[in-house]
């Protein structure tokens, strides 16, 4: 069996999981989210532990068991604590401003770039060169962060651009004459 699927998901206090007709519903203090369970995977709940196992003994079923376990664990963390991603704007004159569900970026183009955040993702700008994105949905948060980063990805020569706070940009040396 998959190494990931062997580890059970522990439910923290205040989080409940219900299963009805292959649909897993997770409820917590930050809302509720649902996940469609794959047909090759079955789930058992014992007190505050959720255990995943494949329904048939095949490599594909084991892979799906690990994937479903990771997805459910992300839902549990999302409805309990939520997720956060930080983006840094590095470059002269690069600025960001969050208003409502829009992020306005000045990143070296002749016009400001406006990005509308997807439903469930919120943004704040503690400084003009930092964007903090928060959401319960890890996948949606990562996609929104990647879309914002895509407007001006970090370049390898000067390191200018939009980068994740934990991202290390490999620098290149300029061409010698």
Swiss-Prot record:
Any one Gene Ontology BP term: cytoplasmic translation
Keywords: Ribonucleoprotein, Ribosomal protein, RNA-binding, rRNA-binding
Disulfide-bond pairs as recorded: none
Lineage top rank: taxon: Bacteria
GO molecular function: rRNA binding; structural constituent of ribosome
GO annotation, cellular component aspect: cytosolic large ribosomal subunit
Pfam (any one): Ribosomal_L6
InterPro entries the record matches: Ribosomal_uL6-like (IPR000702), Ribosomal_uL6-like_a/b-dom_sf (IPR036789), Ribosomal_uL6_a/b-dom (IPR020040), Ribosomal_uL6_bac-type (IPR019906), Ribosomal_uL6_CS (IPR002358)
HAMAP family given in the database record: Ribosomal_uL6_B
Biological function: This protein binds to the 23S rRNA, and is important in its secondary structure. It is located near the subunit interface in the base of the L7/L12 stalk, and near the tRNA binding site of the peptidyltransferase center.
Oligomeric form and interacting partners: Part of the 50S ribosomal subunit.
Family note: Belongs to the universal ribosomal protein uL6 family.
Protein name: Large ribosomal subunit protein uL6
Gene: rplF
């Amino acid at each position: 069996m998959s190494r990931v699927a062997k580890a059970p998901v522990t439910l923290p206090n205040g989080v409940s999981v219900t299963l009805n007709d292959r649909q897993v519903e997770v409820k917590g203090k930050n809302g509720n989210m649902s996940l469609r369970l794959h047909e090759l995977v079955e789930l058992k709940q014992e007190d505050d532990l959720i255990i995943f196992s494949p329904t048939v003994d095949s490599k594909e079923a084991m892979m799906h068991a690990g994937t479903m376990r990771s997805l459910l664990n992300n839902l549990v963390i999302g409805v309990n604590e939520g997720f956060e991603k930080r983006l840094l704007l590095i470059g002269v004159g690069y600025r960001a401003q969050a208003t409502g569900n829009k992020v306005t970026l000045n990143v070296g183009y002749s016009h400001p770039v406006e990005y509308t955040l997807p439903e469930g993702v919120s943004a704040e700008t503690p400084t003009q060169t930092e964007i903090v994105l928060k959401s319960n949905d890890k996948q949606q948060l990562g996609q929104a962060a990647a879309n914002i980063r895509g407007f001006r990805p970090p370049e390898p020569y000067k390191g200018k651009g939009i980068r994740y706070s934990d991202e290390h940009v490999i620098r290149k040396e300029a061409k010698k004459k």
